[in-house]
Each structure stands twice: as C-alpha cells, then as structure tokens.
C-alpha cells in the first residue's frame, strides 16, 4: 500500500510540474501573440500619421490622439486634451491656409510595451511650403511618444514631446 501511494504521489507531482510548464509555455505564446498584435497596431498608427500629415486631413490628424492626450511643442505651452490639440492645429492652419506638405517620413525605434502602455522615440523629416509662393522648407525633428492601448486594441498617443 505504501508503495502505491508513493507512486501515486510521484505521478501527481510529475503531472503537476508538466502542467505548470505547459501553462507557462502557453502564457508565453499568448504574450508573444499579444506583443506582435500590439506592434502591428502601433505600426498602423505610424502609417496613419504619415498619411494624414501628407494630406493635412484635419480629422485624420486628430484620430491618433487619445481624448486626454498632452502635446508638448517647442516654444509653446502644452496642449492638454484632444480639443486643445485640435484648436492649436486649427489656429496654425488659419495662419497658413496655403500650407502644403511635400514630403514626410518618420522612423520610430525603441518601442517598449508594458501593460497597455508603450513609449517610443521617433525621428521625422519633412519638406513643406507655408504658402504656394513660399520656397520649400526642410524640417527635421525628434519626438517622444507615450502610447495607450484602446479598448478595441488600437493605440493612440497619450503624450507627445516634439523637439527640433
């Protein structure tokens, strides 16, 4: 009887250990799938930013900001909230109604994701004309984003800090 209970105990512990290993491997695979999906959604956000910057679509330029976002631009007070960001955008476009973005490229690196939040560092290059008669202007800048995963799995910018 004693030998049977020892064998049963060993079998139980071995099964328990195998279950833990299998569960942790499954969790790792789930985390990897989630991380891959997050990276794909963040890349979509980047592509949307490029597309909407080139077209200067007012609605599109607001779509990648979270409702409670904060944007820091050089020489300006921070825009706190999506409505404040939109107001600043509208003021800029009223000041330069003939603005034309000729080219825009961004490259993000060092994307770190943790618990529905991400941060990233980006470099941007653009060429634009403030009016049809103005000469083209080149601009290079860096940007730091804090991103927030939305309930639908998409990502939005929660904070953006731009430097030149």
What are the residue ranges of the model-derived segments?
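Short, low-complexity N-terminal intrinsically disordered segments enriched in polar/charged residues
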Residues: 15-67
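N-terminal Sec-pathway targeting helices
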Residues: 1-11
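Conserved glycine-rich acetyl-CoA-binding loop
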Residues: 133-134, 153
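Short beta-strand edge/turn micro-motifs at domain boundaries
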Residues: 22, 140-164
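A short, structured loop/turn motif at beta-sheet edges
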Residues: 110-118, 148-154
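Beta-strand elements of well-folded, non-transmembrane domains
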Residues: 126-130, 147
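A solvent-exposed, acidic/Ser-Thr-rich amphipathic alpha-helical stretch
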Residues: 36-43, 58-116, 123-125, 135-139
């Amino acid at each position: 009887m004693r030998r049977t209970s020892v064998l049963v105990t060993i079998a139980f512990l071995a099964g328990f250990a195998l279950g833990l290993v299998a569960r942790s491997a499954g969790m790792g695979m789930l985390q990897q799938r989630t991380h891959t999906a997050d990276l794909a959604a963040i890349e979509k956000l980047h592509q949307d930013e490029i597309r909407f910057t080139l077209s200067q679509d007012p609605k599109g330029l607001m779509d990648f900001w979270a409702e409670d976002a904060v944007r820091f631009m050089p020489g300006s007070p921070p825009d706190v909230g999506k409505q404040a960001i939109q107001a600043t955008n509208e003021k800029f476009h009223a000041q330069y109604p003939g603005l034309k973005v000729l080219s825009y490229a961004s490259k993000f690196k060092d994307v770190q994701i943790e618990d529905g939040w991400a941060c990233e560092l980006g470099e941007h290059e653009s060429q634009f004309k403030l009016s049809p008669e103005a000469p083209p202007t080149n601009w290079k800048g860096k940007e730091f984003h804090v991103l927030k995963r939305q309930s639908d799995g998409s990502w939005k910018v929660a904070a953006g800090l731009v430097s030149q």
